[in-house]
Curated annotation (Swiss-Prot):
Major localization class: plastid
Biological processes, Gene Ontology terms: photosynthesis
Subcellular location: Plastid, Chloroplast thylakoid membrane
Keyword terms: Chloroplast, Membrane, Photosynthesis, Plastid, Repeat, Thylakoid, TPR repeat
GO cellular component: chloroplast thylakoid membrane
InterPro entries: PSI_Ycf3_assembly, TPR-like_helical_dom_sf, TPR_rpt
Protein origin, superkingdom: Eukaryota
Entry coiled-coil feature ranges: none
Stretches forming TPR repeats: 35-68, 72-105, 120-153
Topology class, membrane: Peripheral membrane protein
Species of origin: Ostreococcus tauri
Family statement: Belongs to the Ycf3 family.
Role: Essential for the assembly of the photosystem I (PSI) complex. May act as a chaperone-like factor to guide the assembly of the PSI subunits.
Underlying gene: ycf3
Name this polypeptide is given: Photosystem I assembly protein Ycf3
């Protein structure tokens, strides 16, 4: 039974019902519909912390999805899973792939900045000031772009940029 048919969460159920209706009425191919089902099931598994299952669903969605914009969200969600698992290098790879397909994805830019900021903090704690400054500058660069795309979001990043003079 697909995960989307097992949801106990009201919001997930509502989303599933609305998505199923849209899939029936919108002119989409069979592969597009199937890709969306895998993507939706991946999001559901990811929300429940079932990362291995989510990655399997995203892999299937990726196999079927051809639209670069839609693929960007699959890459982004895979990046989120790797971030949650502390696999920052892998996460960055997926965030960059998401941005290659959708340069206007501020949440990917934000997450890249968060990883660089974290690495900058680690370098600073280790006494490596030159590396920390380089990493903080990279974080600032990505946060500025995320804020440019979504000026009402990322208030903590805006505060950090302001207080550090970046």
């Amino acid at each position: 039974m697909p995960r989307s048919q097992k949801n106990d969460n009201f919001i997930d159920k509502t989303f599933t019902v609305v998505a199923d209706i849209l899939l029936k009425v919108l002119p989409t191919t069979r592969n597009e519909k199937e890709a969306f089902v895998y993507y939706r099931d991946g999001m559901s598994a990811q929300a429940e912390g079932e990362y291995a299952e989510a990655l399997q669903n995203y892999a299937q969605a990726m196999r079927l999805e051809v639209d670069p914009y839609d693929r960007s969200f699959i890459f982004y969600n895979i990046g989120l899973i790797h971030t949650s698992n502390g696999e920052h290098t892998k996460a960055l790879e997926y965030y960059y792939q998401a941005l290659d397909r959708n340069p206007s994805l501020p949440q990917a830019l934000n997450n890249i900045a968060v990883i660089y900021h974290y690495r900058g903090e680690q370098a600073l704690a280790a006494g490596n000031i030159p590396d920390s400054e380089t990493l903080f500058e990279k974080a600032a660069e990505y946060w500025k772009e995320a804020i440019r795309l979504a000026p009402l979001n990322y208030s903590e990043a805006q505060n950090w940029l302001q207080t550090t003079g970046r």
